[in-house]
């Protein structure tokens, strides 16, 4: 469950290292974001000499949360961290590599490019 002011790790090589959620895209009064939701975030930590800089406002899709995700078949998935992938306005990832496991639910939400770059899909 991601809400505004939540810090997230970045799961790609776009240059950002840590994000802070500012807003959840979708409804105007949504309190929490879950896996597959698009958020507006600000970069809190970044790698030097990369296109993305600190305090830059970007969009990101959530790929891992510490809160449990219950599937239709009864399986429960929980990750060790909250992580997101930086995307552009069209929904394509800005990085060329994805780190860590990604949830299968992203495929149903048409983030197929992120799924194809991921080393492991759970």
Curated annotation (Swiss-Prot):
Compartments reported by the entry: Plastid, Chloroplast
Record-level GO BP terms: translation
Keywords: Chloroplast, Plastid, Ribonucleoprotein, Ribosomal protein, RNA-binding, rRNA-binding
InterPro entries in alphabetical order: Ribosomal_uL14, Ribosomal_uL14_bac-type, Ribosomal_uL14_CS, Ribosomal_uL14_sf
A Gene Ontology term for the protein's cellular component: chloroplast
Domain of life assignment: Eukaryota
Gene3D superfamilies, per database record: Ribosomal protein L14
One function term, GO molecular function aspect: rRNA binding
Membership in a protein family: Belongs to the universal ribosomal protein uL14 family.
Stored PANTHER family: 50S/60S RIBOSOMAL PROTEIN L14/L23, LARGE RIBOSOMAL SUBUNIT PROTEIN UL14M
Purpose: Binds to 23S rRNA.
Subunit structure and binding partners: Part of the 50S ribosomal subunit.
Protein name, entry field: Large ribosomal subunit protein uL14c
Biological source species: Cucumis sativus
Gene: rpl14
């Amino acid at each position: 469950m991601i809400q505004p002011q939540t810090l997230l790790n970045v799961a790609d090589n776009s240059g950002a290292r840590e994000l802070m959620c500012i807003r959840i895209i979708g409804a105007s009064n949504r309190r929490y974001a879950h896996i597959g939701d698009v958020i507006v975030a600000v970069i809190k930590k970044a790698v030097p000499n990369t296109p993305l800089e600190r305090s830059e406002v970007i969009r990101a899709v959530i790929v891992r949360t510490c809160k449990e995700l219950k599937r239709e078949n009864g399986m429960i998935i929980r990750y060790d961290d909250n992580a997101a992938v930086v995307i552009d306005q069209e929904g394509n990832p800005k990085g060329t590599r994805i780190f860590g496991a990604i949830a299968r639910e992203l495929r149903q939400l048409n983030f197929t490019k992120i799924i194809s770059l991921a080393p492991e899909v759970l």
